[in-house]
């Protein structure tokens, strides 16, 4: 008896999707120090795009809007005039 072994193959290779398969690296934005935390001068407090949080007392703002401590002290997140601010207050010696 004659047996047929019929196999069908693709005549074109499967094309990969070119619109998918890419994603950007996470930028690690957000708070780097929490409220009440003791930080040293130059420590990064908050990384952001734009001014979501504004610099308060003893806090500077970098070129990319990163907030950093100017002095050693305690971090305090607070509202001033309806906007969020982060400040660093020096530790009071007892």
Swiss-Prot record:
GO terms for cellular component: cytosolic large ribosomal subunit. Disulfide bonds: none annotated. SUPFAM superfamilies: Ribosomal L27 protein-like. One of its GO terms (biological process) is translation. GO terms for molecular function: structural constituent of ribosome. The keyword Glycoprotein does not apply. Residues 12-33 are annotated as: Disordered. Keywords: Ribonucleoprotein, Ribosomal protein. It comes from the Bacteria. The N-terminus is cleaved by ribosomal processing cysteine protease Prp. Residues 1-9 form a propeptide. Belongs to the bacterial ribosomal protein bL27 family. NCBIfam families: L27 (TIGR00062). This is Large ribosomal subunit protein bL27. It comes from Lactococcus lactis subsp. lactis (strain IL1403).
